[in-house]
Amino acid sequence: QGKGLNEYTSLEEAISDLLRANGEAPTPDRKGFVSGKYGIAESNYQKLMRGDYDETHVLPDSHSFAKHTPEKTACFKSLLEHYPVRGKRIDGNARKEWDIKQRGITVLDPDAISPTITGHPDDYLHYCEPRIMTVRECARIQSFPDWYEIKKKYTTGGKMRKIEVPRYTQIGNAIPPLFAELAGIVLKRMI
């Protein structure tokens, strides 16, 4: 709808400017953590999501990296290098074979569209870096523009899930803004 976007945006087209390899700086709202810096916006989708936010901000909001143990990072690195299937959940026997303790994880496919974003950050392994996705990457996939600030804790667990709505959950439970806009346009035409 006049935004210069393709019908489909691959995962890489959506978030390749948010790689950890672009550099790090201390996370402003999360003591002891680091956030990623912007890389060059290459796709029309990245340019649309950034707007002019990156002209006034070096760090994307909520782009703080999880702290993985060396063992988990090694497992993730091995999966990226050797696991043959991208975009499908690793569970069952493959989970045991790769010594994955969590209920399952999906190694993301850079050339495909993203699977549904969930409120659980451990569900997805970044397509080229040995880490889980950041809140900002999930928000970008959901079409939240970079100027949109996400507040509260990054994650929570146990009984606190019933009373807190952390950032990953906010994004995973949200209606993607571009979808909402398009739905509004369609409804307006129907009236």
Where are these regions (language model features)?
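Flexible, glycine-/basic-rich loop-and-beta segments that form/coincide
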Residues: 1-32
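C-terminal target-recognition/interaction regions appended to catalytic cores
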Residues: 33-191
